[in-house]
Structures are given as C-alpha cells and as structure tokens.
Amino acid sequence: MLPCFTRKPVDHPLGFLVALSGLLMQLMSYGIDNSYSIFSDDMHKDPSLGYPSVTTISLGNSVSLGLSPAFGVLCGFLVDRVPPRLMMAVSTLMLFAGLWLSSTFAHNVTAVTFSYCLLASISSACMLSPGAAATSSWFNRYQGLAMGINFSGGGVGSAIIPSLAGKWVVAYGWRKTFRLMSAFCAIGVVATLLSARRAPPKKEEAGPSEYDEGQERQEQGEEEQAHTDEENRNNNNSNGETTPARRGLHTHKLNPWELFLTMFSRAFLGNFFCWLIFSWAFYSLIYVAVPYVSSMGKAGTVYADISPIPTDIASTLFTFYGVFQIVGSILVGWLATGTTNEFAYVLCATIGGIFCAFLGFCRSYVAFALLLCVIGFCMAGMFAVMPALIAERLYGPNLGFYMGAVFLAGVVGGFSAPPIQAELQQRHYGNYTYVCVFMSACMTLAAAVCYITMWRDKRVRIVSAAAEAKLA
C-alpha cells in the first residue's frame, strides 16, 4: 500500500484489508503445512524413499510445525524493523521452493525433511508475526474481530487444501501432489501486495472523533498496566535496581538485553505458557486426525472390527474442521470485542478440552465430523484471541518481537508432539484414546493458566482502579 493509504487513524476500515492479507497468507501456509500427515501412508510405501517408518516420517511434521516458532523469534525481531510485506514475500518464495525441491530431488525421508519441511517451517515463521503485527497496528477497539479475520485463514486453508491433497495423493502420489499444491503459492503473492503497517496520521488530517477514540482505548490499556508496572518497579527498587526496560516497553525500541529482561514479566510469561500448553493439543490434533480416522477397520489395531474409512475420505474431515475454524475465528473475535479476550480464550479452551476427550469414543465418520467441527471452532477462537492478548499487554514498537517470542513456545508442542503421539499409539496397538485424553488435559490446563495469569489479575486491577476513582 502507498503511504497516503496507510496514514490513517486507528480503527480505519482500510485495516480490514490488511487483516484479509493475513488471512490469505495463513490460507496458503497452514493449508499446505497441515496436509503433510496425509502423505504419511504414501511415503511409507514409496520404494524411492526406502520405505521409511511412520515415526521417521512424522519427524518431518515436527520440523515443519515445531521449528517454525523458533524462526518466528528472529522474524518477529525483523518485522519491527523491515516492512511486513518483505517478510511475506520471503515466506511465499520459501514454500514454493520447498515443494518443488523435495518433489524433484528427494530420495529419502531425510531429504524431504530438509528440502521441504525445513523451508516450510521458515516460510510459516515469515508470515505469522508480520501478518499479526501489521493487523494489530490498525486497530484498538476492533482488534479482536480483526485478529479473528486474520487468523481464520488457517481454517480456510484447512477446509480447502487437505481435502484436495487427499484426493490427489491417491490419484497421483505425493511427488506430483506437492507440485500441484505449489499453485496455491500464488495466493501469497496477492497477500503480500495487500499488507502494510499503519502509519500515524498527521494531526491536521486526523478526524478527532475516530482518532481520539483509538487513543482513549490505548490510554485505557496503559491504565490497566499501571498497577502491575508500579509493583515491578517497587520490587526492583527494593533490590537496588532500576527498570528502564519495563518503563520503555510500550514507547521505545529496546535493545536485546532489555528485551530479555521483559521476558520475565507477568505479561509475557502468562501469554507464553498459554501458548506452550495449547500447542501440545493443537499439533497433536493436526498430526493424528487423518491417521486416527483412517485406522478404523485396520488390521492389527484395536479398531479392526470397525467399518473402515479410507484415507481419501478421512482427509475430507479437514473440510469440516476448517469451515468451523473460519466461523470460530470471526465469532470468537467478535465475542472478545464485546466482552474480554481472556473470557473468550478460557471459554474456548474449556469447551475444546471437553470435546477432545469425547473424540476418543468416536468410531464413525459422522461422529468424527461433528466433534472436529466443535474442536476446530474452539481452537480457531484461541488462535484468534492469542495475538490480541499479546498486543493488549505488550503493545508498542517491540510488538513483533513479543509475538514471535510467545509463539516460540510452540516449538515444544510442534516439534515433540507428532513423534511422541505416533510412538504412543503404536505402543498401545494403534489406540488413539491416550492421545485424546492428553489433548483434553492440555486444553483444560491452558484455560486455567489464562485465568490465573491474565483474567483474574485483570479483574483485580479494574476493580481496584474503579474503587480508587470512586474514592477520589
């Protein structure tokens, strides 16, 4: 976008076009990345790869999904200093190159991991923080809704690309399917052209009503942080220390040491652990969904007596999952705008945890579809609210870094969940019940962490501020 278009007041409608660019980037990236487990069986039977084991193939999924947050920290640091569209262009190019390199030159699963999965991981990192940071710069009042639109792209991609990939891999094999999927990278080109960070308007050009409303919203957030900031200063001053990093968090670009110090604040740690615990459930579901459903009727498993569900049919469940991710992202974003981000997150995590437990009892296609609709809705809502939670507490010129640093927690779940879950179900004769219980526990614990570290603390600050205002 040209500077004359980006120099707009807070909450300007043009910001929704930037949110749309984030949606398109996530459609491309997550739609392709989430399809990887669909190729597991075809790669396992491929003589050109040496018939690799399922666990070995799952390591590629770990690299693709798990290392992305690690690269995201660097990308978050860079997006505070370079235009978001540059990062998005790199993301599109890396994903396109990975699909073609692996499908053309890979002759073992290790080559697939390094030629596709590693590049896909970097690609995902280059689009997530830039898209979220660019969108958040346009909004205060409607930030929850805008983030919901931005993060609904994963649902759109999951509804479209995996179902197509499931049909293509049966008809053409994984190599040609990779090349066909590369056509979706054209979406990334369009998204790159639409993305831009908002530039503050000149005072004489800014409409007083819209601009002042955005400023009032930001000042309210600053007041909510005042109580916590004062406690941190008092604690540090009692030890003979000063807190320049904490004082300048929202107003100055911090140096690496100051950024490191702020990572021990309650605002950062609360967001970090919410994402850390949730990532276990999310990446477990992405990896096991299709293998779990397609194991129905498979000999040698506890589901041998169940009516079989072929892989190409099982992959279509991502359509239901993806559609309800779209609905969940937008509706939960709207709910967060009308209530609080913390309430929306806790509600989605609690309901999602309950239905993850029920997933272990499913045996039919219809039952899987119904539960994945609810789980997709809840997980998408958590995805949409998470950046808003980060922006609400860590807003300012360092927001891109904090986005990437919080998403770094996903390394734990993304990198370790797929091989652990693959090994877990194999040790129990293909029984996925343990995986479902684990996902349920993680979702529930994420809700508890959000309530303890953010929602309850926010309510206490608001009540205290209201009491002080009443006494004054």
Curated annotation (Swiss-Prot):
Q: Which residues lie on this side of the membrane: Cytoplasmic?
A: 1-11, 80-85, 130-144, 197-271, 337-341, 387-399, 456-472
> Any idea where this protein resides?
Cell membrane
Q: Which InterPro entries match?
A: MFS, MFS_dom, MFS_Riboflavin_Transporter, MFS_trans_sf
Basic and acidic residues bias: start-end ranges: 214-233
Primary localization class, coarse: membrane
The cross-references to SUPFAM superfamilies, in alphabetical order and at most eight, read: MFS general substrate transporter
So which domain of life are we looking at?
Answer: Eukaryota
**Stretch list, region Disordered:** 200-248
Q: Which family is it part of?
A: Belongs to the major facilitator superfamily. RibJ family.
Under which name does UniProt file this protein? Riboflavin transporter RibJ
